[in-house]
Amino acid sequence: MSVIEEKCNESSYSADSIKVLKGLEAVRKRPGMYIGDVGDGSGLHHMIYEVVDNSIDEALAGYCDLVQVTLNKNGSVTVSDNGRGIPVEIHEEEGISAAEVIMTQLHAGGKFDQQSYKISGGLHGVGVSVVNALSEWLELRIWRNNKEYFIRFNNGITEAPLSIVKENIDKKGTEVTFFPSVGTFTNIEFDFVTIEHRLRELAFLNSGVKILLVDNRFEEVKKVEFYYTGGIEAYVQYIDRAKHAIHPCIVVNTVHVESGISLELALHWNDSYHENILCFTNNIRQRDGGTHLSAFKSAITRVITSYLDTTGLNKKTKHDFSGEDTREGICCVLSVKVPDPKFSSQTKDKLVSSEVRPVVENAVYTKVLEWFEEHPTEAKAIIAKIMEAANAREAARKARELTRRKSALEVSNLPGKLADCHAKDPAISELFIVEGDSAGGTAKQGRDSKIQAILPLRGKILNVERARFDKMLGSDQIGTLITALGISVEREFSLEKLRYHKVIIMTDADVDGSHIRALLLTFFYRHMPELINKGYLYIAQPPLYKVKSGASELYLKNEKALQNYLIKSTINDTYLILDGQEQLVGENLEDLINKVVKFNNLLDHVSKKFNRSITEILAINDLFNKKIFEPESSARLQKALDILNNLEESPDKTNLQVLKHENKIEFFHFSRGLKETKILLKEQLELFEFVEISQFALSIFDIFSKRLKLIVKSKAFDILTPSQLLNTIIECGKKGITIQRFKGLGEMNSDQLWETTLDPTKRTLLQVRVAEVDEAEGIFSTLMGDVVEPRRLFIQANALNVMNLDV
């Protein structure tokens, strides 16, 4: 018998465990109070987390080790676990099943008396009943007592009482499927990456619990499994995977018997210059910290002070250290389990339980100091880093003092390169950061000088990910930027003095421009994160193309926009003749072309792994699958290759021959006396990209199995493949127009720059947001740090996804 089964047998979790405090209507009237923002997506995803948290609470109690979240094709979500199953008996007070009570009463559950659950994700009027109230419909399945139970709700109202639908079932657990209310949420489309991040977090925090995430919404079924036995130590290593740790992880696990508070802690110092501390209470992240974070910081400072005094190392230090110095380069995950946690708000972003502080501070101080004493070599390396941080802080202080003295003597504190705006109100003022004097000059001429300031940055911008704070302050470009913004950095940072509430990075659409943008984003993320949090940082989106037709001009953002323009400009004068009779025109033709565009994109993706032309001709003949290995497919295969050999624009023109083997097919391409071999493995046809393109080709199979003739403005073209159809329409669309591609902002004149990028009524801006801090931390460390291997792996993993590379 497993531990899970034993726990189930011991359980006293029944209908009597469910306590009720009533009402659901308030949830529908003010959903934001219970589930979070219903407009920005946070509340929508919190619906999933509320259900998942119930499963995790079962895991914390020792009754569950498997949780699955499935995003369904119809837009609903299913969350299932192998816990005890929600109680199904009739509730004595309510006269209905306990399951129905839990789903329809706001304050109902087994977490009030701390008998069924000693630890849970806290209690503030949220729960699965809120999910039910804010769903168009919800279905609940329970496996308990060797039976399967079912109940369905519409807008939180029970359709019919809980019923038994199957018996003699050897299974335990709960499954909730819900469809979010369209009337409540602005957008009901779930984001896979957001959910993935939270589930990974939960898997790290609950060692030994397997969490599956399945996305069935698209043809490509995506499945991710999270299972970690290393707990939060593995979490720290995951977060810091792109950095050099200077010692092995320090791990603390302790339980305070009197209060019932337990503490899990994993930390190490790395060679970076930034602290990264993640705090959790009962598996819920506190972005604003709280009593556990304050206790941790205090304990670490005490540990360093005590160790320096004990070892006599304090006599060798040049400068006194601060608490910030002790935490430079620290990476830590701090997780506490508290029986009755108290938070500052409904969102649980800050823990205010005062009883947590002494427990955490004493445990961290005792255990970490003990580790220092047992590992003197590693401890000295940590102390050396802290002393180096103190020295750098002192150097930075002197640099700031020097800057202040210079500024006091100057008539104007603003840098000479800055072309400032006339407005003094930050709320309407904009700062454009541009690369080089050339683009800066054009921008100065084209701007609205009332509200728009231009700051050209010339020369190499410092990578602050690899530089200490004092070196950063010595950088001309960074110094110019800080002065122009009107605010300082680090502890002196204050948004009150910020001179512009729109700070816009405007760089060229080439490799150099992308690099400069990445360097600036790194600076803002590391040293002015509040600028991002307040929504003040933006990225300009200058157009890539200008299309001129007669006297009219149009600017297009990217390659996709240009393609759409060329198709739309041609479609009204175009029709497709099928087998010399049927005509495809108007919306039907447009629908086909949209499918061909998607098919073309799939071909581009697959072409990184196998020849594009061969893939296309096989796919539209239903041969880009295992049917190609069947003997009866040989004639169709040869016919398909004959078509490919006869395509005038095909790069594989001349002669293409084929040789079948049991587990592979060889394609021989003869051209200009040279022979090139392309091999298609049988196992390759099972790859998702290959299966996807094979299945999608079926949607256009009927059309391309016919003899096709395209008529564009009375001119006829024979069509054999989807690519040929798309390319013909695009080429026809280019006739009579002029297309200009901009590689840099300097290629535009001031009027063009105003019209496309500066004019607030026409431009497109991307607002910079950080959805998940630890994921952003990993990306900046990987791409901008000095550890090569994670960056190499990142490039390898994502290289095939690059469609347009400007070299």
Curated annotation (Swiss-Prot):
Site description Interaction with DNA, residues in chain: 460, 463
Signal sequence segment: none
Molecular-function annotations in GO: ATP binding; DNA binding; DNA topoisomerase type II (double strand cut, ATP-hydrolyzing) activity; metal ion binding
Record: residues binding Mg(2+) 1: 435, 508
Main localisation: cytoplasm
Enzyme class: isomerase
GO biological process, one term: DNA topological change
Residues the record lists as binding Mg(2+) 2: 508, 510
EC number: 5.6.2.2
Protein family: Belongs to the type II topoisomerase GyrB family.
Record function comment: A type II topoisomerase that negatively supercoils closed circular double-stranded (ds) DNA in an ATP-dependent manner to modulate DNA topology and maintain chromosomes in an underwound state. Negative supercoiling favors strand separation, and DNA replication, transcription, recombination and repair, all of which involve strand separation. Also able to catalyze the interconversion of other topological isomers of dsDNA rings, including catenanes and knotted rings. Type II topoisomerases break and join 2 DNA strands simultaneously in an ATP-dependent manner.
PANTHER family: DNA GYRASE SUBUNIT B, MITOCHONDRIAL, DNA GYRASE/TOPOISOMERASE SUBUNIT B
Assembly description: Heterotetramer, composed of two GyrA and two GyrB chains. In the heterotetramer, GyrA contains the active site tyrosine that forms a transient covalent intermediate with DNA, while GyrB binds cofactors and catalyzes ATP hydrolysis.
Name of this chain's protein: DNA gyrase subunit B
Organism of provenance: Rickettsia prowazekii (strain Madrid E)
Primary gene name: gyrB
